[in-house]
């Protein structure tokens, strides 16, 4: 079967030039409010300036079931600092003002509390491109599907190596912008080796759709970025960027982002 996308994606103008350049897009994640709100916003702007094609802006949540220890510690610190959802929307505005493209990554509960349509409206008004919802499945996403149509936002759902063919097709059909491929089973975090399950998962998506596929959960080096960029449309980096910011501040964050941006281009140079 082939899954067709129902509407044009906001993110297509980002992925298409990357495909033309024979490279993957670099997608960088940071949580709002770590180590504090102003620094987190500066850090996200630094991602844009250092070569990130898309910035994932995290909404800290008190029960982050899929986050590894690095991100969990950072989000806990942000929550202790009093971060609010409106701070995430302000970060999206700052990224947009810097010429970047932002998507928000959030567990579903904060969106429900804010109001699904109100969140979509305010995210679009801030210049956001879409929403990644790691704990929301399309079957339970009726309100979000409707709100994303009303406000012109992309919706990024997750697929995993364990996804059945039926679940994969349903998820891909509901997604717009890109599909987030979790390259390992379990929680996120930087790893020395990249999962061998990821290329197979990307292939399974491509058998049924031409929607871009972003691979996350583990990248922390130029070499790994180049490796994943060899088969994925997007290389997603989270824990390694959070660690760089926490350990070395904006200088270390910029250096790692530039290294990763070189990594996704390395494959293009070699091909």
Swiss-Prot record:
<dbReference type="Pfam" id="PF00290">
    <property type="entry name" value="Trp_syntA"/>
</dbReference>
<comment type="similarity">
    <text>Belongs to the TrpA family.</text>
</comment>
<protein>
    <recommendedName>
        <fullName>Tryptophan synthase alpha chain</fullName>
        <ecNumber>4.2.1.20</ecNumber>
    </recommendedName>
</protein>
<dbReference type="InterPro" id="IPR002028">
    <property type="entry name" value="Trp_synthase_suA"/>
</dbReference>
<keyword id="KW-0456">Lyase</keyword>
<comment type="subunit">
    <text>Tetramer of two alpha and two beta chains.</text>
</comment>
<dbReference type="GO" id="GO:0005829">
    <property type="term" value="C:cytosol"/>
</dbReference>
<comment type="function">
    <text>The alpha subunit is responsible for the aldol cleavage of indoleglycerol phosphate to indole and glyceraldehyde 3-phosphate.</text>
</comment>
<dbReference type="InterPro" id="IPR011060">
    <property type="entry name" value="RibuloseP-bd_barrel"/>
</dbReference>
<feature type="active site" description="Proton acceptor">
    <location>
        <position position="56"/>
    </location>
</feature>
<keyword id="KW-0057">Aromatic amino acid biosynthesis</keyword>
<feature type="active site" description="Proton acceptor">
    <location>
        <position position="67"/>
    </location>
</feature>
<dbReference type="InterPro" id="IPR013785">
    <property type="entry name" value="Aldolase_TIM"/>
</dbReference>
<dbReference type="InterPro" id="IPR018204">
    <property type="entry name" value="Trp_synthase_alpha_AS"/>
</dbReference>
<keyword id="KW-0028">Amino-acid biosynthesis</keyword>
<dbReference type="GO" id="GO:0004834">
    <property type="term" value="F:tryptophan synthase activity"/>
</dbReference>
<comment type="pathway">
    <text>Amino-acid biosynthesis; L-tryptophan biosynthesis; L-tryptophan from chorismate: step 5/5.</text>
</comment>
<keyword id="KW-0822">Tryptophan biosynthesis</keyword>
